[in-house]
């Protein structure tokens, strides 16, 4: 048996099983994310939320998914059918593909590559193409204009996200996500995590993630009460479901990045409790709760305000933070606190 797993066939089978496990975990989480999002929103508004299908409404998401799947797919006249169907599939698969390099515990990662952060950014950057393709292939000017706005929004906040992560890379000297988590290991538990030295960037990263995922209060592309569905206006049935699934998976990816980069991933918050994958899952669901609460309580921004914040506030702050972290790490300022994280230190 050991010889089989060491063979090319065993390696291929191992990769296939790991890929299926990642897909099963993310898609299973997706079901409860939609349910939790609706329940939290209902609780803030003093409603009950989903409560009919299944116990406590737990099967409501399955019922909604089945409803979308069995509906007729209405294709607009003059639409490019190939691109029309490729766009939602591409958006969901790229978000799902990024989880290949997300570690849930020590050794629990499908591809432990040294450029894991670059891999995630490459996958998330390509999601813009799915949005533009969906708007263009619909052969309608309104979805196309919405797709251009969405692309501008996503690209604008990717710059800030990248600069924030550069600060973490300077602190650890690595782009490997497992190495970043291990750099946060220490005798003081959560006080060793990067949320403390990088506290301002935690806030900036979270807000930028909201804009990157088109989540309220930055859901200007598909504001339900104003723009119907933005670039998804001409989509229905399963293609629309794939677009929505892609957005939730991208949000879950941001929850994973927040947990890994700033909150120790699978590390325990207190030294006397064992580390484990459950800490990673708990932290991811905490950040999902924060995403859901922001959706429920924060009013929507105007588009010009969104772009102004991204380019005139977040970009200078994140760039200045990179310079500050580089200086602190290079010259071992503040009692050598940054020295142990310095590149080459």
UniProtKB/Swiss-Prot annotation:
What Pfam families does UniProt report for this protein, alphabetically? NADHdh
Q: What catalytic activity is recorded?
A: a quinone + NADH + 5 H(+)(in) = a quinol + NAD(+) + 4 H(+)(out)
Alphabetized InterPro entries for the sequence: NADH_UbQ_OxRdtase_su1/FPO, NADH_UbQ_OxRdtase_su1_CS
For this UniProt entry, the molecular function terms from Gene Ontology, in alphabetical order, are: NADH dehydrogenase activity; oxidoreductase activity, acting on NAD(P)H, quinone or similar compound as acceptor; quinone binding
GO CC terms: plasma membrane
What's the top EC group for this one? translocase
User: Which biological process annotations from GO are given for this protein?
Assistant: aerobic respiration
Membrane-spanning ranges: 15-35, 82-102, 115-135, 161-181, 190-210, 240-262, 278-298, 309-329
Q: How does it assemble?
A: NDH-1 is composed of at least 14 different subunits, Nqo1 to Nqo14. The complex has a L-shaped structure, with the hydrophobic arm (subunits Nqo7, Nqo8, Nqo10 to Nqo14) embedded in the inner membrane and the hydrophilic peripheral arm (subunits Nqo1 to Nqo6, Nqo9) protruding into the bacterial cytoplasm. The hydrophilic domain contains all the redox centers. NADH-quinone oxidoreductase forms a supercomplex with ubiquinol-cytochrome c reductase complex (complex III or cytochrome b-c1 complex) and cytochrome c oxidase (complex IV), which stabilizes the NADH-quinone oxidoreductase complex.
Q: What does this protein do?
A: NDH-1 shuttles electrons from NADH, via FMN and iron-sulfur (Fe-S) centers, to quinones in the respiratory chain. The immediate electron acceptor for the enzyme in this species is believed to be ubiquinone. Couples the redox reaction to proton translocation (for every two electrons transferred, four hydrogen ions are translocated across the cytoplasmic membrane), and thus conserves the redox energy in a proton gradient. This subunit may bind ubiquinone.
**Which family does the record assign?**
Belongs to the complex I subunit 1 family.
Please state what the protein is called: NADH-quinone oxidoreductase subunit H
Species name: Paracoccus denitrificans (strain Pd 1222)
């Amino acid at each position: 048996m050991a010889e089989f797993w060491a063979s090319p066939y065993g390696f291929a089978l191992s990769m296939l099983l790991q890929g299926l496990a990642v897909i099963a975990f993310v898609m299973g989480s997706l079901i409860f994310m939609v349910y939790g999002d609706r329940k939290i929103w209902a609780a803030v508004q003093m409603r009950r939320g989903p409560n009919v299908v299944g116990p406590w409404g737990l099967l409501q998401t399955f019922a909604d998914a089945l409803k979308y799947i069995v509906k007729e797919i209405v294709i607009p006249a003059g639409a490019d059918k190939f691109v029309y169907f490729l766009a939602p599939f591409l958006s969901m698969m790229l978000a799902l593909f990024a989880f290949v390099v997300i570690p849930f515990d020590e050794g629990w990662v499908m591809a432990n590559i040294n450029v894991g952060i670059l891999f995630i950014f490459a996958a998330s950057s390509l999601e813009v193409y799915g949005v533009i393709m969906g708007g263009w292939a619909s052969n309608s000017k309104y979805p196309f204009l919405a797709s251009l706005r969405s692309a501008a929004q996503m690209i604008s906040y990717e710059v800030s996200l990248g600069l924030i992560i550069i600060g973490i890379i300077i602190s650890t000297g690595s782009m490997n996500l497992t190495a970043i988590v291990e750099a946060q290991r220490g005798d003081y538990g959560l006080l060793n995590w990067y949320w403390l030295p990088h506290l301002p960037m935690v806030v900036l990263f979270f807000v930028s993630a909201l804009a990157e995922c088109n989540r309220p209060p930055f859901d200007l592309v598909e504001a339900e009460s104003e723009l119907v569905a933005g670039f998804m206006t001409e989509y229905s049935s399963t293609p629309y479901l794939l677009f929505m699934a892609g957005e939730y998976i991208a949000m879950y990816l941001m929850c994973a990045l927040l947990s890994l980069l700033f909150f120790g991933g699978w590390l325990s918050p207190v030294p006397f409790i064992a580390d484990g994958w459950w800490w990673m899952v708990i932290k991811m669901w905490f950040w999902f709760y924060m995403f859901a609460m922001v959706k429920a309580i924060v009013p929507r921004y105007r588009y010009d305000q969104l772009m102004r914040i991204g380019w005139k506030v977040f970009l200078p702050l994140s760039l200045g933070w990179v310079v500050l972290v580089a200086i602190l790490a290079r010259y071992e300022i503040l009692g050598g606190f940054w020295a142990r994280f310095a590149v080459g230190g």
